[in-house]
A protein has these predicted regions:
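Acidic, Gly/Pro-rich loop/turn segments at junctions of secondary structure
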Residues: 31-46, 59, 63-64
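Short, structured active-site "lid" loops
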Residues: 25-31
Length: 257
């Protein structure tokens, strides 16, 4: 359909799913599949839904440029989100950043759902200082101006748009490196790059799904299949996500200053 024009709707996870269940949209990209009840609702209205992965992204933790403590363990991330850690010097004794402010986009977002369901294994966030910044762009802006903040955001928001290779992050904030070991050091901590999603070194990775519920099997199906196809998977790669179906080659290079 080369003459087709799409009208994307950017919204939170709860609103997007409700629109799909009400058949106000027929294609929804999200970071989880259908629950049994949701599948039953759609089938009861006619269309048999189809769910398939199109890519992967990371949940990133970002801090203010002035904060030099940019390595953190998985255990400390969980402690922070559970409210067991409330000040920066509890994580880094030398830190002078004071109380930790945890910044999310909004309470209905897929990012928050992932944190609760996957990182905290179904337990609610209990951090004392939680800020809702409305959307992902606002999370970045809040962290940029708040020295004691830590933002939680999808990793593809962090790419330096001037770098066509997607190998650098924007330079107005710091992207934390996460370690699966008991002590985070530069050599054992990893930032949310596509290569580290692929080899398992980055711990907080989620699957991006296409959910199609189209009774006419028309344009929504065609576009979903396009995204899952070779050209669509190249587009996924260029956005900073890891394609789910494309063949990925990782090459090591040495850079001389």
């Amino acid at each position: 359909y080369p003459q087709t024009h799409l009208l994307p709707i950017y919204t939170d996870d709860n609103t997007g799913m409700k629109m799909l269940l009400d058949l106000k949209v027929n294609l929804f990209f999200t970071s989880h599949g259908l629950q049994k009840g949701e599948d039953a609702i759609l089938r009861g209205k006619g269309p048999i839904p189809s769910v398939f992965p199109v890519g992967y992204d990371g949940i990133a933790f970002i801090i203010n440029k002035s904060n030099l403590d940019s390595c953190i363990t998985v255990t400390d991330v969980k402690r922070l989100l559970k409210g067991e850690v409330t000040t920066w010097n509890q994580l880094y004794p030398h830190s002078d950043k004071g109380n930790i402010e945890v910044v999310f986009d909004n309470k209905a977002s897929a990012t928050l759902h992932f944190v609760v369901d996957s990182i905290l294994e179904g337990k609610n966030i209990k951090s004392q200082n939680i800020v809702a910044a409305k959307n992902s762009k606002s999370v970045i802006e809040y962290v940029k101006k708040t020295p004691n903040a830590i933002g939680v955001i999808g990793s593809n928001w962090l790419n330096d748009r001037s770098d066509s290779t997607n190998t650098t992050f924007r330079n107005d904030i710091r992207v934390m490196a996460i370690s699966k070991t008991s002590k985070a050091e530069d050599y054992n901590s990893w930032q949310p790059y596509q290569a580290y999603f692929l080899d398992g070194r980055y711990p907080f990775v989620r699957t991006i799904y296409a959910i199609v519920a189209d009774p006419h099997k028309a344009l929504p199906w065609a576009f979903a299949n396009f995204i899952a196809g070779p050209i669509g998977q190249k587009i996924i790669l260029k956005t900073g996500l890891l394609p789910s179906r494309a063949e990925i080659n990782i090459r090591e290079v040495k850079v001389k200053n």
